[in-house]
Amino acid sequence: MAASKAKGKLVSIVINNEYIKICEITKSGKNSVVHKTVTIPAPEDCYVDGVIEQTDVLAKAIKVVMDEHRFNANNVAFSISSPRLATKEVLIPNVKANKIDKLVQANATEYFPVNMDEYIIQYTVLEKVEDQGQEKIKLMVAAVPSEVVESYYGLAKALGLKVAFVDYAGNSTYQIMKQQIGPEVSLVIQVENDGTVINIFKDNVLQLQRNVPYGKSMLVNAVMEKYGLKYEAATTKLQNETLLHSRFDGDEVTESLRYMASNINRVIDYYVSRNRLSIQKAYLIGHSTSIKGFATLLSNELNMPIEKVERLKNIALDKKAYVEEATLTSYVTNLGAVIDPVDFIPKRLIESGARKENTKTLIVGFVGALVVSALLVLIPLVQVVALNAEIGSLNKLSLIHISEPTRRSYIS
């Protein structure tokens, strides 16, 4: 379910255990204007399985860099990634838009075998499809632990910012990538630090999305171990030197990506076998595009050409701010988060809002009842007063003495 759109500038923040990416963006129609971008290392032990820990430490690090780069937006959008976040494609009856949420919430336990008291459910409408002769609505339903969302709201409070919405990386990627590709059956691979999002599109509509727990960190760790480097130095080495071989051949650095490639292949096979459609185009996006030899290795192992996404449509740069266009593809999650986000809201706020609405309804009802009661009392009273006044007037007329000359003038 899309969130209500916040107007004006937004700060869009993406956090993982390696880095924090921050953008200042203004959304205008289909286009977004990027004012500022900055990436900083994530403080140690501040991000655990998608939950923000040591909020004050993290907020201080973000505040320092935002002040340094003169960010001035008051609203913040987050796009979260967590191994505890689950998604599922779901078909529901073709109901009215305002009925979808209740239907999803009522059937949530069928979608996800977890304790729903501890999770927040949201959805994205993908398309209408025909299923067994009936028109249905295809949704992407997402479930995230409440504590994950609460931790982001806590961070916003520590930053002194108002939460515009909380999206998740899968939806953020979907929203921006459907603007970048054609109608062909397309594979979009987004490799991030802790995992990889695998998307399959057809006619610019998401058909399948899977998250696999193998990301760039596995490759970086292999380089750290082989060359005795720290994380940042290993990352730089991967960007400057071609350490990856073109095929899996036993080299320990290259072999670190075998599980990732194997899982991508599984997702492709699953889609093709169920739909009898082949992948026509494949795209690579995210941090992996800057790693030398990465696209070549995947292309060879998946047996298809892979195109690196290096420029983004519908994204404009603020002419007054210095932002390199070439760097924007590393902020795709930040940028996608402001297009058409879902809105994960803590249950306490939803319940509080419901209570306020109920209280408002009760007050309106009570005031209405008082008005009706008053009218029921006042109307008869007014009628009685008016009747008494009329009777009084008639009595006065009956007492008026008409002089004899006057009487004669009327009857003569």
Predicted region positions:
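Hydrophobic/aromatic-enriched cytosolic interaction surfaces used to assemble or bind macromolecules
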Residues: 1-398
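Residue-level detector of conserved catalytic or cofactor/ligand-binding positions
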Residues: 397-411
